[in-house]
C-alpha cells in the first residue's frame, strides 16, 4: 500500500506577541493495493522400468508296476487218411495240443 504523508511541526511568531504554537499534521495511512492473481500450469513426465527373474525347479519320480497274465488254451483236432499212408494230424493250436489220427483197417493191412 502507499505510505502515509509525513507529519511536520513548526514554530512561528506574530508581530505583537511571541507565541509558540505547535502544528501537527496527522498522516493518514494509505490503503493497500489488491493482490495480483496468478495462474500456473505444470507438466510432468515419468518413466519406470523393472526387471524380474524367476527360477522354477522341480523333480518328479514315479513307478508303475503291472502284471499282465493270461492263459490261452485250445484243442485242435483233425483226421487224415491216405491210400499211401496216414497223413499227419492237424497242427495243434496254442495251449494243449491233441492230435488225432484215424486209419482204416484196410490201410493197416496193406
Swiss-Prot record:
* The keyword Nucleotidyltransferase appears for this protein: no
GO cellular-component terms in the record? nucleus; perinuclear region of cytoplasm
Feature: compositional bias, Low complexity: 64-83
Please list where the region (Disordered) is annotated.
Answer: 23-97
Localization recorded for this chain is:
Nucleus; Cytoplasm, Perinuclear region
Q: Where is this region: 24 X 2 AA approximate tandem repeats of G-T?
A: 30-79
Q: How is it modified after translation?
A: Phosphorylated with a circadian rhythmicity, probably by the double-time protein (dbt). Phosphorylation could be implicated in the stability of per monomer and in the formation of heterodimer per-tim.
- Give the record's keywords alphabetically: Biological rhythms, Cytoplasm, Nucleus, Phosphoprotein, Repeat
Q: Where are the sequence repeats?
A: 30-31, 33-34, 36-37, 38-39, 40-41, 42-43, 44-45, 46-47, 48-49, 50-51, 52-53, 54-55, 56-57, 58-59, 60-61, 62-63, 64-65, 66-67, 68-69, 70-71, 72-73, 74-75, 76-77, 78-79
* Composition bias type Gly residues, residue spans: 30-63, 84-96
Relate the assembly described in the record.
Forms a heterodimer with timeless (TIM); the complex then translocates into the nucleus.
- Fill in the domain comment: The run of Gly-Thr is implicated in the maintenance of circadian period at different temperatures. Deletion of the repeat leads to a shortening of the courtship song cycle period, and thus could be important for determining features of species-specific mating behavior.
Q: Tell me, what does this protein do in biology? A: Essential for biological clock functions. Determines the period length of circadian and ultradian rhythms; an increase in PER dosage leads to shortened circadian rhythms and a decrease leads to lengthened circadian rhythms. Essential for the circadian rhythmicity of locomotor activity, eclosion behavior, and for the rhythmic component of the male courtship song that originates in the thoracic nervous system. The biological cycle depends on the rhythmic formation and nuclear localization of the TIM-PER complex. Light induces the degradation of TIM, which promotes elimination of PER.
Q: Per its record, how is this protein called by name?
A: Period circadian protein
In its UniProt entry, the species of origin is given as Drosophila erecta (Fruit fly)
Designated gene of the protein: per
Amino acid at each position: 500500500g502507499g505510505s502515509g504523508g509525513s507529519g511536520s511541526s513548526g514554530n512561528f511568531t506574530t508581530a505583537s506577541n511571541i507565541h509558540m504554537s505547535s502544528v501537527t499534521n496527522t498522516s493518514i495511512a494509505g490503503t493497500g493495493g489488491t493482490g495480483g492473481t496468478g495462474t500456473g500450469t505444470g507438466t510432468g513426465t515419468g518413466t519406470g522400468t523393472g526387471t524380474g527373474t524367476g527360477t522354477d525347479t522341480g523333480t518328479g519320480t514315479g513307478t508303475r508296476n503291472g502284471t499282465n497274465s493270461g492263459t490261452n488254451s485250445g484243442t485242435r483236432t483233425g483226421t487224415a487218411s491216405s491210400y499211401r499212408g496216414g497223413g499227419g494230424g492237424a497242427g495243434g493250436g496254442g495251449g494243449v495240443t491233441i492230435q488225432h489220427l484215424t486209419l482204416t483197417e484196410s490201410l493197416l493191412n496193406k
